Amino acid sequence: KIERKKMSLWGRVGVLIFLIVVLIFAFIPYIGIGLDSFGRGWALTPIPVKYTLQYFERVSIETPKFIINSLLYSGISVFICIIVGVPVAWVMARTKVPGRDLLDSLTTLILALPGTGIGIAYMRAFRDPLPFMNTALLGMWIVIPIVLGVRRLPYTVRGTFASLLIVHKSFEEAAESVGAPKMKTFKDVTLPLIWKGVLVGSLYSFILALQEASATLLLVVPGHEMMTVGIFNFYIGGSVNEAAALGFILIILGTVCLFAISKLAGTKMGGVFG
């Protein structure tokens, strides 16, 4: 039996100081990005003496492609995750077909593969023209959402799989017993019960697709760069404030998605991670 022991006053003070120090170090990067993205005048002070929105205007008006491409390609990758991940999760949870355990292992193994490794693998696999096309997939923009979908597939699969385990098979069996085909049973019975889990897993995939840098840096097509590539380009070009502004927008998008996940999951934002 686990018993709680009351800490001494100095013990509580020590723990509080330790947590404050850890939180300060954890939030320093975010504070720095915020100051760089809004700050204009620095007079040898730790914080800016003037603030501006001109860096946000530049990244959102002069170079909006980074934001548009990120939202578009991440959205397409989530669509790929749902189309592939939901059937995979259903096979794993509802069937006894041979090889489903191997399918589970292969899906999870994707998380162990580094983004640079997947990027190099795609470069070698699709550098030659496709049989039915005169161009290689490597030179097309569609390769970016494909690799993003593959990289984030496990999150959609896990979210759907967990929801399927909660829904008892008797609901589906009752529908099938009155003559409903499996597809209709899934659409009318199962899907309405698991849609929150599918959506939560998909939002996780969307957040991580937005933040993907390693694979997209290798597979980037000129004119189709995402926000992470835009941040890199601004930084190496000496436009640190614009890079910070783009990073701040990325943080806001991720925060909004996490808030949506917490609402769907019915828990606080911190509880989303277990």
Task: Please give the residue ranges for each predicted region.
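Transmembrane alpha-helices
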Residues: 17-30, 102, 109, 150, ...
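Loop-to-helix entry region at the N-terminal start of transmembrane alpha-helices
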Residues: 15, 20, 62-74, 112, ...
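Interhelical loop and adjacent transmembrane-helix boundary motif
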Residues: 6-11, 37-44, 50-65, 210, ...
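Membrane-interfacial helix termini and adjacent extracytoplasmic/periplasmic loops
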Residues: 1-7, 40, 44-53, 61, ...
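Transmembrane alpha-helix signature in integral membrane proteins
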Residues: 61-94, 99
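C-terminal transmembrane helix and the adjacent membrane-cytosol boundary/short C-terminal tail
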Residues: 1-6, 90-91, 99, 161-172, ...
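Membrane-embedded alpha-helices of multi-pass transport/permease systems
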Residues: 28-31, 35-38, 83-88, 120, ...
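Cytoplasmic-entry segments and transmembrane alpha-helices of multi-pass inner-membrane transporters
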Residues: 8-16, 87-122
